[in-house]
Regions:
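All-alpha helical catalytic cores of prenyl diphosphate-utilizing isoprenoid enzymes
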Residues: 174, 178, 205-209, 215, ...
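Divalent metal-coordination and catalytic microenvironments
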Residues: 10, 148, 265, 298, ...
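C-terminal, non-catalytic "cap/extension" segments appended to globular domains
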Residues: 2-3, 22-25, 32, 38, ...
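A well-structured
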Residues: 1-163, 490-499
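Active-site recognition of the HExxH zinc-binding catalytic motif
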Residues: 10, 258-277, 295-299
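Post-HExxH zinc-binding segment in Zn-dependent metallohydrolases
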Residues: 287-328
């Protein structure tokens, strides 16, 4: 085999893997959006066949031989090809350590789990979900021991979502956040609370859908390649490549802001994915490099931009056009309403100040279940206890408590810290962006092009070419510093609440 032939085979291999990913991703997307309730077993059967073929292709002798050959000639490969080989070898080595029957069974389990989670949340009965969730945790622990027996299993999964991340780093990061957020929240509680009554009323889903379309276009999303559907828990997924991006939302007719910021959040994910350089499509370099960087983009658009005074001033006339009952209010009142800081039950609805406390609850619970210090059966009670301790709220039922997120049903254990990290990454990226982009002026006029161009140049275009830490440091021109985020919160909410 010549090197040129091997490189062609490398590209063909990745295209095949992307095709399997496309098919399996469509099954997941369908199950979470429009599939009839009784079709989970049918999708699970298809998923088991596809995942087995995907496993065989990934770990097959021909694939292994190809990558060993390319690895032996890596000095003759360009930067992108070297990174492709590195990531594929990493995936293969991990997958080879997991027995195929267990891998296939797990993929089938996740299809079942999504269906069971929906039913459990709908009825607010954790006991329905408990047996499946127990299997998911057990499987994640077992797979971590297979892949990295020398590592703590929770460190392994944290690192899978954010390369190199450890519990020690998370503990230090969260301690820094708590040091600033807890006293800030205490000061806010001592002030007269903001009025957010204008956000509550009756806002027809049809009008909210028009708002979603308007927001997506304003953000600069290409609607020929980005689609929007409804689901129980909003998410974003790429299908096959960054040329097909699907985002989802959930409309609450009593609160338009819920979907508004969900669409902006998921739109941030979609901008990142679709911003990958086109020559990365159908390769392992396509799309976001880590969930922390991904969440830096989603929460950047949702909060740093979407909840800014500049953007709310721009978007408010459109809101009044769609929802005439808002016309008796001002853009400043809207800005203050959407930035009301108050402990609450639902993570996705949380304000910027309390949001990280929601993440910390999930981090502590995952860590303890993984380490055998907490039984899955006891998750609801411990969830409720920590919400009372961290946020001072009483959880009324499982639907508004332990069942609110879809992550565990999807096997995403170790994902949650990425949300808090992403928020902090985003604040530092915004500070850097302001050196060359008049962000407020862009937002006042609804012109996202300069903002998107900066993100594309410094973050999006690279896909998975660089490690997340290196990508972030290159974009920032300095080391990551979480106090940039806490300073942002203190300044913003200090002004809003006259602290």
């Amino acid at each position: 085999m010549t090197l040129d032939e091997a490189i062609k085979s490398l590209m063909a291999l990745q295209a095949k893997l992307a095709a399997y990913g496309h098919a399996m991703g469509l099954l997941f997307y369908d199950g979470a959006t429009t599939a009839p309730k009784g079709t989970a077993a049918n999708r699970g059967q298809t998923m088991s066949i596809l995942s087995e073929e995907h496993y065989k292709l990934t770990t097959g002798e021909e694939t292994v031989a190809l990558l060993e050959f390319l690895d032996a000639h890596k000095s003759e490969l360009d930067e992108k090809q070297q990174r492709m080989v590195f990531l594929l070898i990493k995936d293969i080595r991990n997958m080879q350590k997991i027995p195929m029957d267990e891998y296939v069974a797990y993929q089938q389990l996740l299809v079942e789990a999504d269906d069971v989670w929906h039913r459990a949340k709908e009825t607010s009965v954790f006991a329905l979900f408990e047996p499946v969730l127990e299997k998911i945790f057990e499987t994640n622990i077992r797979f971590a021991h297979y892949c990295a027996p020398e590592k703590d299993p929770y460190d392994y999964w944290l690192s899978e979502y954010e390369d190199g991340l450890t519990m020690a780093q998370c503990d230090e990061f969260f301690a820094t956040l708590r040091e600033h957020i807890v006293p800030l929240l205490k000061k806010i509680k001592a002030q007269p609370q903001l009025d957010d009554a204008m956000l509550h009323g009756h806002f027809p889903e049809e009008k909210q859908a028009q708002l979603s379309d308007y927001l997506m276009r304003t953000m600069g999303l290409d609607l020929d390649h980005v689609g929007l559907s409804t689901t129980e828990h909003p998410f974003t997924t790429s299908l096959g490549s960054h040329f097909d991006e699907r985002i989802t939302t959930h409309y609450l007719e009593e609160n338009f802001a819920s979907s508004m910021f969900s669409v902006i959040h998921e739109g941030g994910h979609a901008l990142y994915d679709t911003g990958s350089a086109d020559d990365l499509a159908y390769t392992v370099l396509d799309g976001g490099v880590s969930m922390g960087i991904h969440e830096s983009q989603s929460r950047f658009y949702e909060n740093l931009l979407g909840r800014s005074r500049a953007f709310t001033g721009f978007v408010f006339p459109k809101l009044c056009e769609l929802f005439p009952e808002l016309s008796g209010h001002t853009a400043e009142e809207f800005y203050r309403a959407i930035n009301k800081a108050e402990p609450s039950l639902i993570r996705t609805e949380a304000d910027e100040v309390t949001y990280s406390l929601h993440v910390m609850v999930r981090y502590e619970l995952e860590k303890r279940v993984i380490h055998g210090e907490l039984k899955v059966h006891d998750l609801p009670g411990e969830w409720n206890r920590l919400y009372k301790e961290y946020l001072g709220v009483d959880v009324p039922d499982d639907k508004h408590g332990v069942l609110q997120d879809s992550h565990w049903s999807g096997g995403s254990i170790g994902y949650f810290p990425s949300y808090a990290l992403g928020s902090a990454y985003g604040a530092q990226l915004l500070r850097k962006m302001r050196e060359t982009v008049d962000v407020d002026e862009c937002l006042k006029t609804g012109n996202f092009a300069p903002i998107n161009a900066w993100n594309r140049e410094h973050v999006w275009q690279y896909g998975c070419l660089k490690k997340p830490g290196a990508l972030l440091e290159q974009a920032l021109g300095e080391k990551f510093d979480p106090t940039v985020y806490t300073q942002y919160l203190e300044e913003k909410y200090g002004e809003i609440y006259n602290l």
